[in-house]
């Protein structure tokens, strides 16, 4: 058994490779890595727009000052625990953070941030994401070895871009990769 060097990918972005993951939730997905340890990994897909919600109704915000719906996009973060919601947001908002990455991003999961967003007092940029993606120990490392994912540094412009459909293509361009040059064969050279 060989000893492998562990590379922590917390705060990085995973880019799904084309022709490898061709169907389902991970096809052309971008995942912001919340945590990556030798015990496993957790991330949020940030380019799977599924709907728009009214924050006031969804979070049952009881305030007569907000008279019109506050519509925000809702993203599917992964196949695990869809009943859990997270705000992936810029770090200019720092109340009751769940995670702070020190790379201008943070994660919150509380009623206070939804109220602050509804009142226009929330973070400059945010995504509301339900569910998350999780890997067992060694699983992500295996997927990386078989070229299912590319790794790039966090880029807020990709995360908070207006058009979720173009995020994946823009990430490839940022990496200097043209989709048509990918082989449909998997493995290592």
From Swiss-Prot:
Coiled coil located at which positions? Answer: none
| Source species, domain of life | Bacteria
Query: Per its UniProt record, what InterPro entries does this chain match?
Result: AlgH-like
- Return the SUPFAM superfamilies for the record: VC0467-like (SSF143456)
According to the UniProt record, one GO cellular component term is: cytosol
Q: Which family does it belong to?
A: Belongs to the UPF0301 (AlgH) family.
Identify the NCBIfam families for this entry. PRK00228.1-4 (NF001268)
Protein name as it appears in the record: UPF0301 protein A1G_00270
User: What organism is the protein native to?
Assistant: Rickettsia rickettsii (strain Sheila Smith)
């Amino acid at each position: 058994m060989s000893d492998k060097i562990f590379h922590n990918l917390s705060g990085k972005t995973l880019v799904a490779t084309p022709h490898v993951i061709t169907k389902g939730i991970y096809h052309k997905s971008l995942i912001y890595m919340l945590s990556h340890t030798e015990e496993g990994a957790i991330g949020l897909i940030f380019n799977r727009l599924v709907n728009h919600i009214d924050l006031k109704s969804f979070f049952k915000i009881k305030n007569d000052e907000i008279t019109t719906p506050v519509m925000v996009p809702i993203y599917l973060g992964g196949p695990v625990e869809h009943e859990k919601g997270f705000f992936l947001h810029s770090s200019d908002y720092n109340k009751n953070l769940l995670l702070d990455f020190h790379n201008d991003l943070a994660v919150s999961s509380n009623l206070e941030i939804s109220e602050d967003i509804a009142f226009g007092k929330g973070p400059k940029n945010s995504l509301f994401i339900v569910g998350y993606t999780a890997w067992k120990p060694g699983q992500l490392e295996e997927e990386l070895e078989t070229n299912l994912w590319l790794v790039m540094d966090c880029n807020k412009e990709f995360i908070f871009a207006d058009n979720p459909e173009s995020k994946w293509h823009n990430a490839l361009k940022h990496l200097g990769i043209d989709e048509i040059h990918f082989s449909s064969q998997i493995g290592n050279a």
